[in-house]
């Protein structure tokens, strides 16, 4: 992916390449550590919690309180050893997710997307990958799920600037998975009844390795 020219202007937090997609693979360690260092880890909501099963509210205020939310999300993601986290996974019904995720080439990507929309891709770009998928909100459970191995998301960055993110392989799966969360869908909602039942069985039989919010 080509880097932006040094004289190219972009109002966002991250630089962009020559196609307008964010370059989210630079300074990953420093950026993630900075966010995480300002945050407080929160417990993870699990399947059955109402906040996970409804569409979240758009982010319209990008002020100090929102910046703290993003920092808390990075801290929570690290505690739970996740590669992506949506706000409703820590109980906040806002359309924002964070990610710290490698692609299939091992390149690390770190960023924030608010009010995301998945770009509808033409059929010739929708090659399906049926790898296993898991979710912090369905702890210890995994199931194969077919998703396109390339994804593009449009939205806003943490300051409200327009942003475009794209990913391949595992990172593409992450972008789709986290966007789903913000519209009230878990990955198990895309499984067959039998596969969903098996995922919930896995969850019931094992203990999560991170703090979770108990359902009433």
From Swiss-Prot:
GO terms for molecular function: metal ion binding; peptide deformylase activity. It catalyses: N-terminal N-formyl-L-methionyl-[peptide] + H2O = N-terminal L-methionyl-[peptide] + formate. Fe cation binds at residues 135, 177, 181. Pfam families: Pep_deformylase. Its cofactor is Fe(2+). Gene3D superfamilies: Peptide deformylase. The active site is at residue 178. Binds 1 Fe(2+) ion. Its EC number is 3.5.1.88. One of its GO terms (biological process) is co-translational protein modification. Keywords: Hydrolase, Iron, Metal-binding, Protein biosynthesis. It is an enzyme of class 3 (hydrolase). Removes the formyl group from the N-terminal Met of newly synthesized proteins. Requires at least a dipeptide for an efficient rate of reaction. N-terminal L-methionine is a prerequisite for activity but the enzyme has broad specificity at other positions. Belongs to the polypeptide deformylase family. This is Peptide deformylase 4. The gene is def4.
């Amino acid at each position: 992916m080509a880097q932006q020219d040094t004289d190219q202007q972009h109002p966002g937090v991250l630089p962009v390449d020559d196609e307008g997609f964010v370059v989210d693979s630079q300074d990953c360690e420093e950026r993630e550590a900075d966010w995480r260092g300002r945050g407080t880890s929160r417990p993870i909501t699990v399947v059955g919690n109402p906040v996970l099963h409804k569409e979240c509210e758009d982010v319209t205020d990008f002020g100090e309180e929102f910046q703290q939310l993003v920092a808390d999300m990075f801290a929570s993601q690290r505690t739970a050893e996740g590669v992506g986290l949506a706000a409703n996974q820590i109980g906040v019904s806002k359309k924002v997710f964070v990610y710290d995720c490698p692609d299939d080439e091992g390149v690390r990507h770190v960023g924030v997307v608010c009010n995301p929309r998945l770009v509808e891709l033409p059929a010739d770009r929708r090659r399906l990958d049926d790898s296993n998928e898991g979710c912090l909100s369905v702890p210890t459970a995994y199931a194969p799920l077919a998703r396109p191995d390339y994804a593009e998301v449009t939205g806003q960055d943490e300051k409200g600037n327009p942003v475009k993110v794209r990913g391949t392989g595992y990172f593409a799966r992450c972008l789709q998975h986290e966007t789903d969360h913000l519209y009230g869908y878990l990955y198990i909602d895309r499984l067959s009844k039998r596969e969903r039942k098996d995922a919930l069985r896995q969850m019931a039989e094992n203990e999560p390795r991170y703090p979770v919010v108990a359902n009433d």
